[in-house]
Amino acid sequence: MTATQPVHLVRPAPVHVHPSSERWSVEAIEALFALPFNDLIFRAQQVHREHFDANAVQRSTLLSIKTGGCPEDCAYCPQSVHHDTGVEADKLMDVATVRQAAQAAAAAGATRFCMGAAWREPKDRDIEKVVELVREVKSLGLEACCTLGMLSKPQAQALKEAGVDYYNHNLDTAPEAYGRIISTRVYEERLQTLAHVRDAGMNVCCGGIVGMGESRRERAGLVAQLANLDPHPESVPINELVQVEGTPLAGSDKLDPFEFVRTIAVARITMPTAYVRLSAGRQEMGDAIQALCFLAGANSIFYGDKLLTTGNPDVERDEALFERLGLTSA
């Protein structure tokens, strides 16, 4: 970590939980995690089949439209100005470049095009430019998703009016672990942005990252926060930490792969109608672990060889895996 002082340095504030949060207590979710592996996977697969085609997987493509230079100090992120990772700050992509990427994604079979920008919170003039990009993506018949940082209520409304279908804003981890991961944004601010997204009428995409040194109880706490949003997110990306040299979490102990599969299963059981997405970390997963994740209820992936600044399985590998497993595109 560099000597640069964090921007907007604040301490994590108390989390205001929706009254419906008692629907899933942390203890109840811990009990799911503790089930024998076969019993947990069987239960998750039962829930999955009640709501989805068990052999269909939705494909999204993620493009970094503005990379690096983020003032946040997230301990996992190579785009933070506080970490020396070699990621250079870029300007916002132009319409022609985004159009070309979206066309390639559609041709490869993606149905949703996600655009990510390394901002703490976009300025209104940034939103105006993103609106142009969204309209271009929508003109190609793709669903549009954005992840731009914190939003004001008017900004969320502007994105909705432009045609954004999903807005991603992750909780990252449980409230109890949050202060170890980031100090430049409080948990309540994340929840407030999610409320603005929901009020504007966009679908909520919200998940977190596992493998950051958290305990199982803290993983259960993250799932509880997600499941107790009212309603729960329509899309839930579950990321496994990708360790990047120069970030504070580089060199962390690896998460047991079966614990990752358990997290997928618990997310499926507690959020039965959500698309549970295998997100960052897939490149290092073996095919057998990915297959177990699909069995546990994962039904969405990021498709393409790059996720923002980190690697992802190439299209050919995914196509081969889908064929071996008999999976189709949702």
From Swiss-Prot:
Task performed by this protein: Catalyzes the conversion of dethiobiotin (DTB) to biotin by the insertion of a sulfur atom into dethiobiotin via a radical-based mechanism.
Reaction(s) catalysed by this chain's protein: (4R,5S)-dethiobiotin + (sulfur carrier)-SH + 2 reduced [2Fe-2S]-[ferredoxin] + 2 S-adenosyl-L-methionine = (sulfur carrier)-H + biotin + 2 5'-deoxyadenosine + 2 L-methionine + 2 oxidized [2Fe-2S]-[ferredoxin]
Similarity annotation: Belongs to the radical SAM superfamily. Biotin synthase family.
Binding note for cofactor: Binds 1 [4Fe-4S] cluster. The cluster is coordinated with 3 cysteines and an exchangeable S-adenosyl-L-methionine. Binds 1 [2Fe-2S] cluster. The cluster is coordinated with 3 cysteines and 1 arginine.
Binding site for [2Fe-2S] cluster: 114, 145, 205, 277
UniProt cross-references to NCBIfam families, sorted A to Z: bioB
InterPro entries: Aldolase_TIM, BATS_dom, Biotin_synth/BioAB, Biotin_synthase, Elp3/MiaA/NifB-like_rSAM, rSAM
PANTHER family xref list: BIOTIN SYNTHASE (PTHR22976), BIOTIN SYNTHASE, MITOCHONDRIAL (PTHR22976:SF2)
Protein name per the record: Biotin synthase
Residue ranges annotated for the Radical SAM core domain, each copy included: 55-282
Annotated keywords: 2Fe-2S, 4Fe-4S, Biotin biosynthesis, Iron, Iron-sulfur, Metal-binding, S-adenosyl-L-methionine, Transferase
Pfam family, one: BATS
Biological pathway: Cofactor biosynthesis; biotin biosynthesis; biotin from 7,8-diaminononanoate: step 2/2
Subunit composition and interactions: Homodimer.
EC number assigned by the record: 2.8.1.6
Residue sites binding [4Fe-4S] cluster per the record: 70, 74, 77
Cofactor: [4Fe-4S] cluster; [2Fe-2S] cluster
GO molecular function, one term: biotin synthase activity
Origin organism lineage: Bacteria, Pseudomonadati, Pseudomonadota, Betaproteobacteria, Burkholderiales
Example GO biological process: biotin biosynthetic process
